[in-house]
């Protein structure tokens, strides 16, 4: 499947609008001063008040494509898949649907809309610790969708738990990350060496406190998929800098 960045943005929004989401649009790359960071680092950052329970004027199902600066990845910039600036394709549930709907929609979008081979998808889930249980619910849903048992991996908090580091009061929880082989034509690719993360579904079930975590009153979903990485796979390329986004800038 060949696709332009414009077509990818439009197809992402169209898919989630068909599931009852409203496009909230992108905000400035510069932080608004309320979150203590200079730049927007994730699509969910401007939505923090609503993820914590404030009603959003456009409803409980939202989507957009947001420009982000991710300085935490700066040492990895220059490889096949990391960028200082990138566009995050996102969608959110604010106390509405949860894991069952989200895993099904992500799988549908990747395989039916974008044509990725479901047999080659790998997915990781939270292995659990003293603060939160193993995410067997998500693993079971992945199996029901057809993800192969040997392609589902349980990983620790450092890999499959999302939170804003050091920020007390913010929502957090286990995430379900999706991976695809950097070279889909390679026979028997090995995880993780031959795979690249293309996106993740974060299940915000908790609020971070000084002493740990407490359950959120409303469970939220925060999804983020990198437009740049999706372009790589959908256009049969092996490096993000080969996409049309960098034409004229990278020889």
Question: What is the role of each PLM region?
Answer:
Residues 1-251:
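Alpha-helical segments
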């Amino acid at each position: 499947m060949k696709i332009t960045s414009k077509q990818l943005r439009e197809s992402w929004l169209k898919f989630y609008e068909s599931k009852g989401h409203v496009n909230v649009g992108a905000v400035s790359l510069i932080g608004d001063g309320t979150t203590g960071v200079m730049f927007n680092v994730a699509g969910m950052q401007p939505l923090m008040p609503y993820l914590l329970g404030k009603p959003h004027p456009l409803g409980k199902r939202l989507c957009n494509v947001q420009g982000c600066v991710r300085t935490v990845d700066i040492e990895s910039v220059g490889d096949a898949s990391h960028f200082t600036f990138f566009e995050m394709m996102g969608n959110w549930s604010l106390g509405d649907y949860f894991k069952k709907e989200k895993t099904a929609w992500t799988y549908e979008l990747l395989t039916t809309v974008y044509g990725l081979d479901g047999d080659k998808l790998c997915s990781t889930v939270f292995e659990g610790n003293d603060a939160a249980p193993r995410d067997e619910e998500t693993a079971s849903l992945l199996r029901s969708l057809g993800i192969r048992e040997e392609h589902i991996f349980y990983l620790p908090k450092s890999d499959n738990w999302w939170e804003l580091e050091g920020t007390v009061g913010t929502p957090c929880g286990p995430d379900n990350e999706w991976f695809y082989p950097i070279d889909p034509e390679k026979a028997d690719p090995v995880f993780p060496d031959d795979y690249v993360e293309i996106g993740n579904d974060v299940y915000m079930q908790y609020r971070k406190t000084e002493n740990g975590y407490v359950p959120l009153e409303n469970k939220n979903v925060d999804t983020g998929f990198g437009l740049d990485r999706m372009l790589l796979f959908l256009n049969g390329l092996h490096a993000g800098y080969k996409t049309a986004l960098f034409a004229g800038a990278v020889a």
